[in-house]
Design a protein with these regions (language model features):
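C-terminal transmembrane beta-barrel domains of outer membrane proteins
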Residues: 396-547
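Transmembrane beta-strand segments of outer-membrane beta-barrel domains in Gram-negative
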Residues: 287-431, 490
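Transmembrane beta-strand segments that form the barrel wall of outer-membrane beta-barrel proteins
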Residues: 200, 204, 225-235, 246-252, ...
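Feature captures outer-membrane beta-barrel proteins of Gram-negative bacteria and organelles
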Residues: 244-253, 271-292, 314-323, 365-373, ...
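Extracellular loop and loop/strand-boundary signature of outer-membrane beta-barrel proteins
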Residues: 177, 233-234, 261-262, 301-307, ...
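Periplasmic polypeptide-binding modules associated with outer-membrane biogenesis and secretion
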Residues: 22-233, 264-272, 424-426
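Repeated loop/turn-to-beta-strand initiation elements of outer-membrane beta-barrel proteins
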Residues: 200, 225-227, 254-260, 283-288, ...
Length: 547
C-alpha cells in the first residue's frame, strides 16, 4: 500500500512541476549544451585576439642604401645592355630604357633607371631581385646594367620551442636555389598567422652565398601549457549556484600545434567533465576537433528534492574546420560537426520506486559558416549553423528536426579605451517538442543578466544586448560597464505574456597579471512570472586564476 501511494504521488508530481524540470534548462543534457556554447564562445574570443596580433605581419627586408648626387658627368645614352634575366621580359626593360635613349644623361639618370627596374621587380613580387650598376668604363654611350636575381638560400626557424621546424617551413613556398616570389611568401605569412596560435615574423638578409637571400623566421609562441581555476555563482538554483572549474590546455602536444584540453566542473548537485583534441590537417589551417563531455546532475532544491531527480548525459563529437579566406580585414571559415548524445533522467531516486522519465538518443549533423570582419577600430563576427537532429526517445519513437542558429557579435573601440559592443543569438526550429538540449534558453550571465541561468526556454527564440565599457585607470586593468539585455522565446510550452526577459545593470571587471574578476549587478525589469515575484537584483560574480 505504501509503495502504491508513493508511486501515485510521484506520478502526480511528474505530470506537473516535475515535467517542467525534466524538459527545463537545468537537466544534464541542457547544462552540457550551455557548457559547450561557453567553450565555443571562448574559442572565438581567443581566435579574434590571435587575429589582431597577426593582421600586420609581412616579410621584412634590409633598407636600401641612399645614393649620393652624381650629376656632374653627362653623356649621350646610345644603348643599354642587361645581364640575363628569368623574370623581366625584353619589352618591359626596353620600355624603361626608351625614356633615356639619345639624351644627355648623368649617373643620377642611370640610378633613376635602375630604381624603375627595381620597382618592376617589386610589382612582380620579387623583392630579392635587383638591378645594379657594375664598375665599368662607359664607351660610345653603351651602359651595362646587371640584374641580380637572388635565389633562396638558407631558411632558418628561430625560437620555435614547441613547434617543429617542418611545420613552419612546409607552410611557405621557399625552395633552396629557387627564385621565390616575395608577394606569395607574404600571403602565406598572413595566412599562417591567421590560422595558427603561434605568430611568425620573417626577415630577409643577404645570403651566405653570393646571389642568394636567406630567410630568418622568428616564432612567437603563446604559453604552451595553462592551468586555470575558476569559480562563479552563475549555476542553477536546482543543482547549485556556486560552481568551481578546472581547465587544462596544452596548445602543442606533439609540437605540431595539436591542442589537448581537459576541464572539470563541480557544484553542489553537478559533476561534469570534458576533454578534447585538435589535429591540424596540412598547412592551410584545416583542423579536426575531437570532443567528449559528460554531465551528472542531481536536484538539490525544490519540490522534488525529497523524492530525488538525477540526470546523466554524455556527448561525443568531431568537427572539421576549414578557413577559406584569411587576410588583414577578414576571416571566413566553413565547417561540419557530427555529435552523438545520450541523456537520461530518473525520478524517485531517493525512494524505493525509481522511474526512468527521459531516455533520449541524439545524432546531430551541423554544417556551419562563420565570418569575421575587421575594421580600423571595429570587429563584426557572425556564425550561421544548420542543426539536423535525429532523436529517439524513451518509447523508441524517432523524430527529425532542423534548427537554424545565428550567433553574432559586434564591437567598436575608441582610443581612450572605451568600447561599445553588442551580441545577438537566435534559433528557429522546424518542429515543436524538442528535447531540452536542443531548445533555446534565455537568462543568465551569458544571456539576459539579472535572471537565473536558463530561466525561460522554448523551441525558438533570440537574445540581444548592448554594453558600454569604460576604463577606470590608466593601465585599463579596471573597467566599468553598463548594459541592456533582452530575450524572447517561442514554442508550444511557452506561456503567453511570460515569454520574454529584459534587464539592465552595471558591472566591474578587473584584470590582473594571473587573475581576472567580474562583478555584475543585474536588474530584471520584468519580475512577475507564474504568480511569483523575482528579486529586484541579481549579482553575477566570477573569478579566474591562471597557474
Amino acid at each position: 500500500m505504501r509503495r502504491s501511494l508513493t508511486a501515485a504521488l510521484l506520478l502526480s508530481m511528474m505530470c506537473s512541476t516535475a515535467f517542467a524540470a525534466a524538459e527545463g534548462g537545468d537537466d544534464a543534457g541542457a547544462q552540457m549544451r550551455r557548457a559547450q556554447e561557453a567553450l565555443e564562445r571562448q574559442r572565438v574570443i581567443d581566435q579574434i585576439n590571435e587575429d589582431e596580433q597577426s593582421r600586420r605581419a609581412e616579410v621584412e627586408q634590409e633598407a636600401p642604401t641612399e645614393q649620393s648626387d652624381q650629376s656632374s658627368v653627362t653623356f649621350t645614352l646610345k644603348r643599354v645592355e642587361f645581364s640575363p634575366t628569368e623574370i623581366l621580359s625584353t619589352e618591359e626593360l626596353q620600355t624603361i630604357v626608351d625614356e633615356y635613349l639619345e639624351r644627355d644623361i648623368s649617373l643620377n639618370d642611370i640610378n633613376a633607371m635602375i630604381e624603375k627596374i627595381n620597382a618592376l621587380y617589386v610589382d612582380k613580387g620579387y623583392m630579392t631581385c635587383r638591378a645594379y650598376l657594375p664598375p665599368q668604363r662607359i664607351h660610345e654611350g653603351v651602359v651595362q646594367i646587371g640584374l641580380l636575381e637572388g635565389r633562396t638560400g638558407n631558411v632558418n626557424v628561430i625560437n620555435n620551442k614547441h613547434t617543429l621546424d617542418s611545420y613552419i617551413k612546409n607552410s611557405f613556398p621557399l625552395s633552396r636555389g629557387a627564385l621565390d616570389n616575395t608577394v606569395r611568401v607574404n600571403e602565406h605569412l598572413q595566412w599562417f598567422n591567421g590560422v595558427n596560435d603561434v605568430q611568425l615574423r620573417m626577415a630577409m638578409k643577404a645570403g651566405s652565398e653570393f646571389g642568394t637571400t636567406d630567410y630568418d623566421i622568428y616564432a612567437f609562441e603563446p604559453r604552451n601549457q595553462r592551468l586555470s581555476i575558476m569559480a562563479d555563482n552563475n549555476g542553477y538554483e536546482s543543482s547549485g549556484r556556486w560552481r568551481e572549474y578546472v581547465f587544462y590546455n596544452n596548445r602543442s602536444l606533439t609540437n605540431q600545434r595539436d591542442a589537448f584540453r581537459l576541464y572539470w566542473q563541480h557544484s553542489k548537485g553537478t559533476e561534469a567533465w570534458g576533454t578534447g583534441y585538435t589535429l591540424p590537417l596540412g598547412h592551410r589551417g584545416i583542423k579536426l576537433d575531437f570532443d567528449y563531455s559528460n554531465n551528472n546532475t542531481e536536484n538539490i532544491k525544490g519540490q522534488m528534492k525529497s523524492f530525488g531527480v538525477e540526470s546523466d548525459s554524455y556527448s561525443a563529437g568531431v568537427t572539421l574546420r576549414v578557413p577559406f579566406k584569411v587576410d588583414r580585414t577578414s576571416r571566413y571559415e566553413a565547417g561540419f560537426q557530427y555529435q552523438h548524445q545520450e541523456s537520461k533522467t530518473d525520478f524517485g531516486t531517493k525512494t524505493d520506486l525509481r522511474l526512468r522519465w527521459v531516455d533520449d538518443n541524439y545524432n546531430r549533423y551541423i554544417p556551419y559558416v562563420s565570418f569575421t570582419h575587421y575594421g580600423g577600430h571595429s570587429i563584426l563576427y557572425h556564425k550561421h549553423s544548420a542543426r539536423f537532429i535525429r532523436r529517439r526517445d524513451l518509447t523508441g519513437a524517432t523524430g527529425d528536426s532542423v534548427n537554424y542558429e545565428l550567433n553574432g557579435f559586434w564591437q567598436r573601440q575608441w582610443s581612450g579605451g572605451q568600447s561599445l559592443s553588442s551580441s545577438f543569438e537566435a534559433q528557429l526550429s522546424s518542429r515543436q517538442g524538442l528535447g531540452s538540449s536542443d531548445r533555446f534558453f534565455i537568462g543568465g550571465n551569458n544571456s539576459v543578466r539579472g535572471y537565473e541561468e536558463s530561466f525561460l526556454g522554448g523551441e525558438e527564440g533570440f537574445t540581444a544586448n548592448l554594453e558600454y565599457t569604460l576604463p577606470l585607470d590608466r593601465s585599463r586593468r579596471l573597467r566599468a560597464l553598463t548594459f541592456v539585455d533582452y530575450g524572447r522565446v517561442y514554442g508550444s510550452t511557452v506561456i503567453d505574456g511570460e515569454n520574454d526577459l529584459v534587464s539592465t545593470g552595471v558591472g566591474l571587471n578587473a584584470y590582473l597579471k594571473n587573475c581576472s574578476m567580474s562583478l555584475t549587478l543585474g536588474v530584471p525589469l520584468k519580475r512577475h512570472f507564474g504568480g511569483e515575484h523575482l528579486d529586484k537584483t541579481r549579482v553575477h560574480f566570477s573569478i579566474n586564476g591562471n597557474i
